[in-house]
């Protein structure tokens, strides 16, 4: 028996891939909130807020109820939650983890992981080496936690992970949520 412990080759998205289509497909498979569009001058927090606002995952006007909502009340608070500056050369694994990892239960990441890694690499290339990447914590990309898998919420979900990138005239938002 000849077993190979070599990692498989990277998933090939094809020549000149439509990253928006691939991102949407992975998001559909993994139930993620995603946005890929032009950089229209919004900052990371405002962009994240605007993408999340129509989802029902924000409660900006709540502050007096007994539920104890934990998410941000404004784009400024969302910006403060996105406090981890991810170097562009490290953004691809953050993207892939946010696209596929279950935030509540550890386990299988499914067959879509190689595609998510390819999409992450493609998005990093699209936004370029000068892109500004931000994340709200290490609940998805646990490898970046350095001992503490903490996060600052960007939604009202029990668990959430967000990666937001702006660069080269493009902007991307990827948000995962989980409930236990």
Please give the residue ranges for each predicted region.
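N-terminal "domain-start" segment
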Residues: 1-113
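Acidic, proline/glycine-rich low-complexity IDRs
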Residues: 110, 114-180
């Amino acid at each position: 028996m000849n077993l190979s412990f070599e990692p498989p080759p990277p998933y090939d998205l094809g020549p000149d891939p439509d990253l928006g289509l691939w991102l949407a497909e992975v998001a559909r498979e993994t139930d993620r909130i995603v946005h890929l569009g032009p950089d229209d001058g919004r900052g990371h927090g405002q962009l994240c807020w605007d993408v999340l606002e129509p989802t029902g995952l924000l409660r900006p006007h709540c502050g007096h109820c007994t539920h104890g909502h934990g998410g941000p009340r404004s784009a400024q608070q969302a910006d403060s939650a996105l406090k981890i500056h991810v170097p562009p050369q490290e953004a691809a694994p953050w993207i892939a983890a946010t696209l596929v990892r279950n935030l509540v239960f550890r386990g299988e990441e499914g067959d879509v992981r190689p595609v998510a890694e390819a999409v992450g690499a493609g998005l990093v290339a699209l936004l370029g080496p000068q892109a500004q990447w931000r994340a709200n914590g290490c609940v998805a990309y646990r490898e970046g936690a350095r001992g503490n898998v903490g996060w600052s919420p960007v939604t009202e979900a029990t668990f959430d992970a967000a990666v937001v990138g702006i660069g080269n005239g493009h902007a991307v938002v990827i948000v995962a949520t989980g409930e236990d």
